[in-house]
């Protein structure tokens, strides 16, 4: 298991040179905001996200997650409506994103009808491309076969893949198939990661997507990946690695050495903070409060300037 | 080995929803529902982006009974991401009924493969008749941190 949240593995785990480069690329321009101009967290960041977005050479992508189409509980009686609003919000961003990544739990029950619905809705996104990784709700009882039939084109193994775009190397992992309490990647996928980055320069910024966190956010609820440490060991030589996950339905950020993890929120319903309550039980918020717990995330990376901005926006 | 007597029954949907509604929003106002002694790693940043969440532990008191003494019953509730009772002791030939009272889907799946429910959505039940003595550990395949045991006496 990787280092527990808040534990060891701090800056001493990386060389000073790595730390400086990492800080220059990431720490200097992490921007977490919400819509309406209300700034939640703003760390350094001379270049604002808006300025970066106007740079034609900038990479801009959006992460959406955990739409759970088919969920009907009181925590959100209209997940289709909120996912639709999330798509509208992506389409209303200042510039068309290079790609949109849905980090899993597209559906609630892995039914063909739910997969059809989510694919249809994703077609409404105005973006250069749309990618997905599966959540455990997308692979119920069939090891992800229905998911891959619809979203697995061009992927390897059980649905993992990678690509390069505007100087950034993107890796999309599948850690929801061989669940044993925690998320699991497996030897084939670990080998894929090792080979995938073998030829890359250590200066290449890496962005890694998975559904379940690659760090130990709260293992008692399955919020971690048991062999993530092995995958991350192949990424240790890179100056900057950004891991973006879903699954936990809430924002959370953590840095371990050269790797920064960002859990995204959901478009469906919130879950409790780690350990609050008996389990990851969907939260039914007071009337009018749900929208503030849901959202989308847009990320911008400007080549050359080595700046990256992450903005988390509440669902409008 | 698939055993006889496995059926899926679909009553009690309304009952499940009523129970869930009862432990939803209003539960946040009930004092003393927070679980003591659980370590909560503080969000490094942006935890504030979820106003109101911290005041909603929303747990049904008592449903998260830990590893308690074995209980003789023929009904197991799936609630708050736990099988309750966590261990049941029955006689050979008994039919157990599991009912999902969560908003999330769950399964009842023996680690040995001896039985395996379909996906149980809110309010759905699953029955299995135990025809051989022994100890059966099982879990939810969607949330495999949910584990429990059936002990079948001769």
Regions found by a protein language model. Name each.
Chain A
Residues 175, 209-214, 246-248, 312-313:
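Short, well-ordered beta-to-alpha junction loops that form the rim of enzyme active sites
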Residues 71-73, 106-107, 176-185, 215-220:
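Surface-exposed cleft-lining segments at the edges of enzyme active sites
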Residues 1-18:
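N-terminal secretory signal peptides
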Residues 22, 29, 38, 42-116, ...:
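N-terminal active-site segment of His-dependent metallophosphoesterases
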Residues 52, 111-205, 227-242, 254-265, ...:
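Extended active-site neighborhood of metal-dependent phosphoesterases/phosphodiesterases
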Residues 69, 107-108, 138, 214, ...:
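Short active-site segment of divalent metal-dependent hydrolases/proteases
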Residues 64-65, 100-104, 131-136, 209-210, ...:
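Active-site neighborhood of phospho(di)ester-bond hydrolases with catalytic His/Asp-centered motifs
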Residues 201-217:
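Short acidic, glycine-rich surface-loop motifs adjacent to enzyme active sites
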């Amino acid at each position: 298991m990787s280092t527990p949240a808040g534990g060891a593995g701090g800056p001493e785990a990386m060389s000073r040179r790595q730390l400086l480069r990492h800080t220059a690329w990431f720490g200097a321009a992490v921007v977490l905001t919400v819509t309406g101009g209300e700034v939640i967290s703003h760390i350094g960041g001379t270049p604002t996200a808006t300025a970066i977005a106007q740079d034609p050479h900038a990479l801009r992508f959006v992460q959406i997650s955990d739409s759970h189409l088919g969920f009907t509980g009181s925590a959100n009686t209209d997940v289709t409506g909120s996912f639709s609003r999330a798509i509208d919000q992506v389409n209303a961003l200042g510039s068309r994103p290079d790609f949109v990544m849905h980090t899993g739990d597209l559906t609630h029950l892995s039914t063909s009808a739910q997969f059809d619905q989510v694919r249809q809705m994703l077609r409404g996104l105005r973006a250069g491309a749309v990618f997905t990784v599966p959540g455990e709700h997308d692979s119920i009882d069939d090891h992800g076969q229905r998911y891959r039939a619809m979203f697995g084109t061009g992927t390897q193994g059980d649905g993992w893949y990678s690509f390069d775009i505007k100087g950034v190397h993107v890796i999309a992992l599948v850690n929801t198939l061989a669940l044993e309490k925690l998320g699991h990647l497996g030897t084939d996928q670990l080998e894929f990661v090792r080979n995938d980055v073998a030829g890359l320069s250590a200066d290449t910024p890496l962005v890694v997507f998975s559904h379940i966190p690659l760090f130990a956010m709260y293992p008692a609820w399955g919020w971690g990946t048991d062999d993530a440490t092995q995958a991350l060991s192949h990424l240790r030589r890179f100056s900057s690695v950004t891991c973006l996950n879903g699954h936990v339905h809430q924002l959370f950020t953590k840095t371990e050495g050269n790797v920064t993890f960002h859990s995204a929120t959901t478009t469906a319903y919130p879950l409790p903070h780690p350990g609050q309550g008996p389990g990851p039980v969907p939260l039914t918020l007071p009337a009018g409060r749900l929208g503030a717990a849901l959202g989308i995330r847009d990320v911008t990376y400007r080549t050359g300037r080595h700046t990256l901005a992450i903005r988390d926006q509440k669902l409008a | 080995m698939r055993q006889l007597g496995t059926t899926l029954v679909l009553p009690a949907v309304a009952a499940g929803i009523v129970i869930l509604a009862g432990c939803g929003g209003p539960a946040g106002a009930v004092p003393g529902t927070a679980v003591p002694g659980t370590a909560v790693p503080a969000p490094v940043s942006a935890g504030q982006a979820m106003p109101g969440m911290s005041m909603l532990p929303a747990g049904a008191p008592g449903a998260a009974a830990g590893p308690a003494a074995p209980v003789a019953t023929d009904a197991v509730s799936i609630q708050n991401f736990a099988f309750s009772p966590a261990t049941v002791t029955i006689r050979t030939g008994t039919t157990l009924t599991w009912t999902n009272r969560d908003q999330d889907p769950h399964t009842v799946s023996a680690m040995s493969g001896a039985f395996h429910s379909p996906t149980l959505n809110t309010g759905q039940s699953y029955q299995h008749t135990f025809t051989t003595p022994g100890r059966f550990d099982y879990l939810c395949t969607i949330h495999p941190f949910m584990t429990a045991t059936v002990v079948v006496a001769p």
